[in-house]
Amino acid sequence: MSRFIELSHTIREGMKTFPGLPGPRSVLLFDHAGSERVYKGQAEFLIASLHLCGNTGTYVDSPYHRFREAPDLSALKLERLADLAFVKVRQRDRLGRGIGPSAFDGLSLKGKAVLVETGWSDRWQTQEYFDPNPFLTEDACRYLVDAGAVFVGIDSANIDDMSDLRRPAHTVLLGNGVTICEHMTNLAALQTNEGRLHAVPIAWQGGATFPVRAYVVLS
């Protein structure tokens, strides 16, 4: 029997994912009581309009997030988002914030997702979450591209050093078609590299980023 490991934060109305971006909100179109009248007491439904920034909760970046003429959410290949073999790299005890290529030495990464556990998600929904964050260096990202990784996730507030306006991690990874997933959580629950990762956004044409329900299936 399969077991599932949740890797996404729950989205709650008004929560903050990134400084300066609006929190999600739900606008009720009609509720159970109102719909009961429409269906003459035979059924009832709730329908709401959900308003959220693409960068809400745990989300993936398409290349269009960084580059004007690049593939958007609707162009992402499912084989690079679902049923992925993965390698988790634990970096809770790193020296300094920047995670360099040595963290991935000797790992077989071709065609796989790389999940970087920093422990930063322990600060989720606190002001400390937006302190200077753990990130991947430009050299680390080039290493991952050269090694053939197809998906890179991290449990930090950003895969880049937020003080570096060049955003080299986004530039290198998305520029080479590697999907990014930020604000992951519960990576400590992955005790081995067994199982398959799934993290699929909706196929929104013209969309650049969108929340995902990221999880691992253990057989």
Language model features with spans:
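Active-/binding-site microenvironments in catalytic and ligand-binding cores
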Residues: 1-219
